[in-house]
Amino acid sequence: MQGNQAVVDYMNELLSGELAARDQYFIHSRLYSEWGYTKLFERLNHEMEEETTHAEDFIRRILMLGGTPKMARAELNIGTDVVSCLKADLQTEYEVRDALKKGIKLCEEAQDYVSRDLMVAQLKDTEEDHAHWLEQQLRLIELIGEGNYYQSQL
């Protein structure tokens, strides 16, 4: 099936973002493991797996539309401590959210409702799961302090 080229090109941009998010979560999860924060490791490892699924969904759709997936990832923003890792991941999720909203609009204009629905599902996951959880963690750090937060993540 030949898809709208603008949609395919934009999905490749989204794929690049998902690959970067996956790799960033991978590195951050391993940092958490190294630092002894088991709960943070487990959560970020789970997020990495979800980002891999998001990337796979885009790859399958790009192929279905007759395109070639571009596997180059966007730049990573690697933190140096728990707070900077959480903030970097939240910024990445905000960027993904904004890109998905733009992609949804493009798909509607191109009348590609299947690609649109894929992006809507990923937007829901980004806003209601990933970004929300990261916002909660940063809010907890503000409320209970870094030391208490770190202790809760062992």
From Swiss-Prot:
Record PROSITE patterns: BACTERIOFERRITIN, FERRITIN_LIKE
Keywords tagged on the record: Ion transport, Iron, Iron storage, Iron transport, Metal-binding, Oxidoreductase, Transport
Coiled coil location: none
Keyword Transport annotated: yes
EC number: 1.16.3.1
Residues making up the signal peptide according to the UniProt record: none
Enzyme class: oxidoreductase
Binding, Fe cation 1: 18, 51, 54, 127
Tree of life domain: Bacteria
Domain Ferritin-like diiron residue range list: 1-145
Entry GO terms, CC: cytosol
Record-linked Pfam families: Ferritin (PF00210)
Residues that bind Fe cation 2: 51, 93, 127, 130
GO BP annotations, alphabetical order: intracellular iron ion homeostasis; iron ion transport
A molecular function GO annotation: heme binding
CDD domains: Bacterioferritin
Catalytic reaction(s) noted: 4 Fe(2+) + O2 + 4 H(+) = 4 Fe(3+) + 2 H2O; Fe(2+)(in) = Fe(2+)(out)
Keyword ATP-binding included in the entry's annotation: no
PANTHER family linked: BACTERIOFERRITIN
The family this protein is said to belong to: Belongs to the bacterioferritin family.
Protein purpose: Iron-storage protein, whose ferroxidase center binds Fe(2+), oxidizes it using dioxygen to Fe(3+), and participates in the subsequent Fe(3+) oxide mineral core formation within the central cavity of the BFR protein shell.
Subunit record text: Heterooligomer of 24 subunits, arranged as 12 dimers, that are packed together to form an approximately spherical molecule with a central cavity, in which large amounts of iron can be deposited.
UniProt-recorded name of the protein: Bacterial ferritin
Organism name: Neisseria meningitidis serogroup A / serotype 4A (strain DSM 15465 / Z2491)
